[in-house]
Amino acid sequence: MVKQQGSGKTNLANEDEAYEAIFGGEFGSLEIGSYIGGDEGANSKDYTEHLPDAVDFEDEDELADDDDDLPEESDANLHPAMMTMGAYDDVNENGAVLGIDSNSLNMQLPEINGDLSQQFILEDDGGTPATSNALFMGMDANEIHLATETGVLDGSGANEIGHSQLSIGGVNGNDMSINGGFIMEPDMSDGKHKKATKLDLINHEKYLLKKYFPDFEKGKILKWNKLIYRRSVPYHWHSEISRVKKPFMPLNLKFKVQQDDKRLFNSRTISYVAPIYQGKNNLLQSNSSASRRGLIHVSIDELFPIKEQQKKRKIIHDEKTISEDLLIATDDWDQEKIINQGTSSTATLADSSMTPNLKFSGGYKLKSLIEDVAEDWQWDEDMIIDAKLKESKHAELNMNDEKLLLMIEKTNNLAQQKQQLDSSNLILPLNETILQQKFNLSNDDKYQILKKTHQTKVRSTISNLNIQHSQPAINLQSPFYKVAVPRYQLRHFHRENFGSHIRPGTKIVFSKLKARKRKRDKGKDVKESFSTSQDLTIGDTAPVYLMEYSEQTPVALSKFGMANKLINYYRKANEQDTLRPKLPVGETHVLGVQDKSPFWNFGFVEPGHIVPTLYNNMIRAPVFKHDISGTDFLLTKSSGFGISNRFYLRNINHLFTVGQTFPVEEIPGPNSRKVTSMKATRLKMIIYRILNHNHSKAISIDPIAKHFPDQDYGQNRQKVKEFMKYQRDGPEKGLWRLKDDEKLLDNEAVKSLITPEQISQVESMSQGLQFQEDNEAYNFDSKLKSLEENLLPWNITKNFINSTQMRAMIQIHGVGDPTGCGEGFSFLKTSMKGGFVKSGSPSSNNNSSNKKGTNTHSYNVAQQQKAYDEEIAKTWYTHTKSLSISNPFEEMTNPDEINQTNKHVKTDRDDKKILKIVRKKRDENGIIQRQTIFIRDPRVIQGYIKIKEQDKEDVNKLLEEDTSKINNLEELEKQKKLLQLELANLEKSQQRRAARQNSKRNGGATRTENSVDNGSDLAGVTDGKAARNKGKNTTRRCATCGQIGHIRTNKSCPMYSSKDNPASPK
């Protein structure tokens, strides 16, 4: 609490005693008036002695009020800890602060102990300049400390002031001094309390240091980059690639363009300008007496009745006038006369007799000039100062006035304009619409509607993109591009066995991947980036794209080093669509609304959608991206350059599934001229390269034969003889040189003879040819053989390309579907004259049954084309949906469970025949039992037939051999046994043949006997029907009754109505 000082006994005349009294706490309320007297004399009771340098504090209440008017300054000078407490609403008489929640105060200052009676204490260290400031209410606000009963809070680290505490305020009550919410309490003079206060201050400073600078260590420099908050701002050159910027496209573009002043000045059209005042002479007169409609002509005399001299002035309200400012601005000023104080050009031209008629750009003649009136230029300074200028002689309209709505009339009445135009002002129409109206004799503008609704040009699919191959592919580098591919590679086309060249028990050690940076390939062509085969290895850190084909045998596949592009085709949603979306992988190509599909008529790119596509010069196919499992890695093997196998284990960057491939070019056939000429060209390429490396320009056949292992010496010699000449004598005897008319091509010209795509197509043809040979050797089903031949590469590519040109139709569905479940296209050819049948229709199984024998059309062309297009769309979207599924693969829990996907596998033969095998087997009692087995699986039946045919071939070989040459006794016994078996079979066949002839001969007797055995009831029917069949010689036997001469569907059968006959009516 603050002690109140009464009338002290201290002698204030002494300066030292006065200061001791002040710092001793006797001036608690700062009522210095009790010590220092007022206006009354020294003899008064209330007289107080003043210090020599005392300051008057009478107006301290007014000063406090003035300080309240400066909230910003007071808030700025407060301590930060005080700022968090908020403004004090009120203070009661007991000094309690009102409007402050204790909970909120404790939250803001957790380190301060005590109740709500927290006070602000001023301390003095005794030696700081702040001592006098604190005394005379001029202390710095930063020196204010927040204190409790036990300690002092100093957020700014200020020094202590004095040994005692002062209370600031002008209101005393209950031993408290309150001013603006600041409550001051005198400090105790106890030494222990001071030490505790200093200790609390030190602890609080350590707490603040640990809170705001947790990484602070004594003797180390702080890392201000981590402590100071920095706002993350992108660089000005940085652009987000993933974010698709939406372009700003206003729908209604209407720009108001101001007319060019130069054109208006030089034009001959009528302009709307301000009128010109005239003096004694007329300044301008209208060439036309007609006035515009809607204008009321009022003279100045009616508006302003002024002096006679001013009455002579008239306002010419004509639309063909020129403003005065414009005349002055465009006049030719005589600078010499102006500088020499001569007569101005305007004054000189005032005389109409000396002035010739002037023509302006509008075509009007100026008959008189403006008369310079001296009265208009005589201004009185007093009138200007007193704002008593004379009134304006005409109304002034400010075009920029917001309260005025000015509209310019635009008359489209051509007849009225023609009347106003004089014969001297007739000019040629310069407007484009007027010129078109003059020559618009056939109403050409009416035909413009057809041009708007009809699009004259539709882009025929994106032009062929440029595909750049690597240097090894362009060079057709061996052994990657062989002239003759071995059979084992053709049978495993692009599916080489990974462990074929690895010895069993080999220890695999993974090598480290080679680092390949993007800077190395930046700005380079494909030839430069992949100049050698080492650059094409997968054993580096370059990203890898795995393309898994959905077909078992694609139409054509790229070889080593050939380039492919991943194109993201995007079709515009409408004509105003300017969006160009970009996927993380691939090159974006935008298709117009009317552009054709990149898949011709067998695929679709919907408006506003993206279809990623694998693009090269041989095929096009849609691709579908899939997520890669975190447990999947790629194991690769690399060999070459005299180094053993090296193994690499790396992650997979991108995984795609390739849909059905659509061929771009036709695969040549085995005996086509294209293949024959390519073989000859390939031979020339090899010879040219050998000659370019040989200085003598002569070679032998041996280095050429290495590239053609399937040809002998004579075949190579015959082909080389076409363009080379054999040297029979001379130093080059036995060698071959080019003929005189043959030119040796350099290596660059040799590379252009054959492209890598042609080599890939020939290899695809070779693979199909090898498959055909294997099919003929191991496939015994004639129907399946013919189907496989129709599905060879050169057949299906020809069918597809003809169908894209609308010269043929393909089946779309059926046995030629590579998926086997209706999710792919069948490229088998079908007839365009009613041959196409929609899937699921009953006529799709047997097309020949619906064909009519007449010459009339049994189909509708429009309906067939509609069904054809619908089937294409159905197959395309089914194909897309199936390959887009990203469900994880589920292993079969029960391997014996029937898989529903095998429902299309045949379980019966087409001819409905089964195999019956009768085997003799002894049972457990030693008795021979007959065991009959029926086999219906066509594949098992085919296997048995193949074994039987093989045994027959072995028998024939054994029988053809001469017995005299057989030295082995076992072979003789085997041959004897085979001969006996063959003889028994021949005897059985002879007996069956004889029995068949006897049955034909005795057919009548047999029929009679059978009729008697069947009973008397059936005999009457038989006899009645027999008369009808008399004279017919037939050998047909009924399956129900066994009689000859009819079948079971014939009503003449005696058992036709019996239950055993399946043909009988039920």
From Swiss-Prot:
- Recorded family membership: Belongs to the TAF1 family.
Q: Which domain of life is it from?
A: Eukaryota
Can you list the GO cellular component terms from the UniProt entry?
cytosol; nucleus; transcription factor TFIID complex
E.C. number: 2.3.1.48
Native species:
Saccharomyces cerevisiae (strain ATCC 204508 / S288c) (Baker's yeast)
**Anything else known:** Present with 1500 molecules/cell in log phase SD medium.
| InterPro entries hit by this protein | TAF1 (IPR040240), TAF1_HAT_dom (IPR022591), Znf-CCHC_6 (IPR041670)
UniProt key word Coiled coil: yes
Q: Return the Low complexity bias intervals.
A: 839-856
Q: Tell me what gene encodes this.
A: TAF1
Physiological role: Functions as a component of the DNA-binding general transcription factor complex TFIID. Binding of TFIID to a promoter (with or without TATA element) is the initial step in pre-initiation complex (PIC) formation. TFIID plays a key role in the regulation of gene expression by RNA polymerase II through different activities such as transcription activator interaction, core promoter recognition and selectivity, TFIIA and TFIIB interaction, chromatin modification (histone acetylation by TAF1), facilitation of DNA opening and initiation of transcription.
Biased region (Polar residues) positions are 1000-1014
Task: Show the segment(s) annotated as Disordered.
Answer: 836-856, 989-1036
**Any coiled-coil regions, as ranges:** 409-425, 944-1000
Which GO biological process categories is it annotated with?
positive regulation of transcription by RNA polymerase II; RNA polymerase II preinitiation complex assembly; transcription by RNA polymerase II
Bilayer-spanning residue ranges: none
Gene Ontology MF term list: chromatin binding; histone acetyltransferase activity; molecular adaptor activity; protein heterodimerization activity; RNA polymerase II general transcription initiation factor activity; TBP-class protein binding
Free-text domain note: Compared to higher eukaryotes TAF1, yeast TAF1 lacks the C-terminal bromodomains and C-terminal kinase activity. The TFIID interacting proteins BDF1 and BDF2 may substitute for these domains.
- State the protein's name: Transcription initiation factor TFIID subunit 1
Q: What class of enzyme is it?
A: transferase
